[in-house]
Amino acid sequence: MSIRNLIAENAIDDMKKEIKKASGNEVFFRGIPSDDGIIVEVEVIARGNETSVAALINRMKKGEVIIHNHPSGFLVPSQNDIQISGVYGESGGGSYIINNDVDDLYIIVPLKKMNKIDINEYFGEKGLIKSKIEKFEIRDEQLKMSKAIEMAVNNNEKIIIEAGTGTGKTIAYLIPTLLYAIENNLRLIISTNTINLQEQLLNKDIPLLKRILNKEFRYTLVKGRGNYLCKRKLYNIDFEEFKEESDKKIIGNLQKWDDISETGDRSELKQEIPYRIWEQANCESDLCTGPKCNYYGSCYFFKARKNISESDLIIVNHHMFFADLSIRNEVGFNTEYSILPNYDVVVFDEAHNIEDTARNYFTYEISRFGFGKLVGFIHNRRITNLANAGTLTKVLHYLNTELDSSDYEKIDSLKTSLIEELNSFYEKGIEIFDKMLYPFAQEIGNSEIKRRIDKDQIKNSSAWKDITKANTEFKHLYVELAKTINKFMNIIENHELEDEDGIIFDFKKYIDRLKEYYKNFEFIVNNDSEDYVYWFSVTPNKNNIKLFATPFDVSEDLKENLLSKLNRMVFTSATLAVEGKFDYFMKSMGFDKNDKQLSKHLISSPFDYMNQMRVFIPSDTIDPNSIDFIAETEVFIDKL
């Protein structure tokens, strides 16, 4: 096949120039195809030597083409070429080898050509929707929205679309995106902001689509890891941990439930479980031992994860989507270590919340309560019984039974200093939080207090000087504590114990959490970055203060980690535009105004607000907090 049947003339010329610039050495190109699969644009990703080049496939989007040259002119793939092409080819991409003159080509993996869809048969008086749902109301706005999304997915584009209330957005975006995913064997993600919309999709809209499309597909709702029971944690609980008989009964009921549950999902429970108990038995990412766990084969979370990996359509909330995205940012967009399986098409419903969700996700947070709770998980000096005294006490008890007396002496010699240093570290940390809290003691009442921390205003105040002095002491205590912990862990690791129940594992993970907490503490208290706004809140009627560092702008993060990785994305909501323009949304999200693969649509509501709606504001209503408010309001509405 002629190279010009696969690569446009301008792209051929660009590659010739780049290979010449690289002195004829290997160059790794990102090939960007048009709708018909012709490479119309190339971008240099890496330059190498005569025989090799870095293959940075994580910098490419799905459905593109790896192109690299062989300076020798011998266009036979190496073992590395085949391996890398195989990995990228799994995502629908292609891989070509060219010579330095760019007039010859070898196809390792052909570019997968996508099947285009046509949704016309589903809408209209004789459409499939109407045939399945007799009372279906045909709305021009819904068809207009659905056709716009059809064009976007067919053309490998992003689309921003505001559709007013009453459009029927979920059906409008589900039909084209789901149909496209099914026809091309792709995975679709629907990300929402609210539980209500997730339940609507799961229990109403998607089952309805199954009837309309008459096509087989699997779908699932992804829940956070903390919703699942962890068998290892559950059966490591000692009933003597709990003084209250009612608490012991709850633990017993959890164990009975484990015997019959298929999912281990907390929502199955008919009994409300206090969080203080649930968190001792739920699944947590950093406390998971994975395949090493004795319960791995029957793990609820990994069973759910397998179900997710086999699904064609996945429903998530925005927070989980960005939690997954942060992992992809660390290890590469197409990775097996992510929370979600790899995906190809994304719909963000309630997209006006994305910026806030992303900003919240990238926010650092510390609190007095959180600090005390974390240290208590390691060592709780107020409790002497084994289970609730913290993971350190459990580790010491375990080591005392596993090691002979001479080996345990080394541990025992560090025990006192480790506990004393933990206590001192805790006391100084609480002292700092209390110093921050003290100026607002008189204001604490029924409402939350929120203030921005302006370093220039407070740095010369006596209160800030006290905090700075205490923080210097706190840092010194942390350094000494870290040294002692390292000595303690080195002794343990030298013995290579089995740790079947994960007692040492849990202790190490809580220490890791403490290290991360201290890093966040330093970042917030130092207040040095101009890219963040620093602020705090004081909880009403409680001696708890929370401190935050929130990024001013997340657009670059979103541009680099999301928008540059995928094209087929739908951003929709009833409120995205300001005065009929998407400028603010685009700027806050990191969109390029000149992006040729972006379309924008503004669809009005089918409701005639001017003639069908009135706004009434009662001037004599009672306090909304009154128990009589609803009854009084009913009377008011009846009068209307």
Identify the role of each PLM range:
Residues 94-95, 102-144, 150, 154:
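Helicase-associated low-complexity/disordered flanking segments
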Residues 116-132, 137, 185-187, 191-314, ...:
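A substrate-engagement module of RecA-like helicase motors
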Residues 154-159, 186, 312, 567-568:
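Pre-Walker A (Motif I) flank of P-loop NTPase domains
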Residues 155-176, 188:
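Walker A/P-loop
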Residues 173, 179, 199, 204-207, ...:
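Signature of the SF2 helicase/ATPase Hel1-core->accessory helical subdomain module
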Residues 190-196, 214-231, 340-353, 366-377, ...:
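Conserved beta-strand -> loop -> alpha-helix junction used to position metal-binding or nucleic-acid-contacting
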Residues 279-314, 325-335, 474-477, 481-621, ...:
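A contiguous, basic/glycine-rich beta-loop/short-helix subdomain that forms a polymer-engagement track
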